[in-house]
Amino acid sequence: MTTRLFGTDGLRGQVNIYPMVPDMALRLGLAAGTFFRNGNKRHRVVIGKDTRLSGYVFEMALTSGLCAAGMDVFLVGPLPTPAVAFLTRNMRADLGVVISASHNPFHDNGIKFFDKDGFKLPDSQEDAITEMVLNQNHRWDYPEPERVGRAHKIQDAPGRYIVYLKNSFPSTLTLDGMKVVLDCANGANYRVAPLALEELGAEVIRIGTSPDGLNINHKCGSLYPELAAQRVRETGADIGLALDGDADRLIVVDEKGTVLDGDQIMAICAMDMMEKGRLPENRLVATVMSNMALEVFMKERGGSLLRTPVGDRHVVEAMRRTGAAMGGEQSGHLVFMEYGTTGDGLLAALQLLRIMREKNRPLSELAGLLTPFPQQLINVHVQRKIPFEQCPEIGRAVEQAEKELAGRGRVLLRYSGTESVARVMVEGEDDALVGRLAAGLAETLQQHLR
């Protein structure tokens, strides 16, 4: 069986520690270029990155490998992950590559691939690439010297993405008179997001738009929405938008400074789409982490919630399989299949702003559609990731917690696909009970997974 090199969101790790080393990036470029090369036509790949200092290292290594494999490389510089997915389709490329570790600190980085249609690669293709990369005896099928690829910088890539975003917003509407607090996490959207909102007429109050290579996600962005909330209260803004480092997720703050997560944003957007007949079979796709209240919300309105494993990749796969138009994660990955192929924080923000404009209602009123059940999420750092069912003590603790919830709540244990972390999630009707059970389960995991 092929060793899994890729997690739920590509390859990720600490810079200059295996596997996030330049040699790995070079071999990944060679392998991906070889795998996607087909026939004698010129092959093209789009490479984008976020604002991490190490992005230059992996950009150059990947470019070398891809060019050596016969791919022409289009370098678009710091741009959001969804922008690279869009540009891969828009530029008729064979492959898209993003260099980013998303919401992680600057000392981490990652590499993920998109196919020609802008979708993340399936396991089978990632495994084929992995097999070439890890086989030190693999004989590379290098092209003839005249078929070696060229590298080009694409200067107008940000402008193309802005036009794409604005085309998702009705031409009959503007954001004139709206005050928007925008936190770009010193990440990939630091240039594009403010410009797109300002071109639509909004007054933008900027946070996290001065990247220095080291400050990406540092006490800002979607993991620190209280920063945007404070600025909303100070300035009287209509809304706060907090993006993560690669801008594929969104957390929102209403005009009162209340933080809204992905579940609440999905409820608002799903309701709007159901009213307009734009949500096929009134089906919404979300992960096992989404609050039970979202499931109840959809059922009460004649709809349904289809749950998937964690990761926007799994959400998108389920959407494609079922024909769903919208899906997302509580963490803020939101996918609108009419417009894009992956989570896009700014595109999701524009959909929310459109609804606010069309209904002429403040965000706090719209958010009243969904009242989340009490939920507690605890991250437990682990030394090993053994299957939970192989530890009887963990099984007994889960069984006891479910017994106390008496069918009026959920317990979920899972490992992170990108970090050495086990996640404990408990939700139910009683806040105190939920907190106590979550803390007890976290302690059990700490004892048995060290």
From Swiss-Prot:
Binds 1 Mg(2+) ion per subunit. GO terms for cellular component: cytosol. Its cofactor is Mg(2+). Activated by phosphorylation. The modification Phosphoserine is found at S102. The keyword Phosphoprotein applies. The active site is at S102. Keywords: Isomerase, Magnesium, Metal-binding, Phosphoprotein. Pfam families: PGM_PMM_I, PGM_PMM_II, PGM_PMM_III, PGM_PMM_IV. PROSITE patterns: PGM_PMM. It is an enzyme of class 5 (isomerase). Disulfide bonds: none annotated. Mg(2+) binds at S102, D244, D246, D248. HAMAP family: GlmM_B. Belongs to the phosphohexose mutase family. Catalyzes the conversion of glucosamine-6-phosphate to glucosamine-1-phosphate. This is Phosphoglucosamine mutase. It comes from Oleidesulfovibrio alaskensis (strain ATCC BAA-1058 / DSM 17464 / G20) (Desulfovibrio alaskensis).
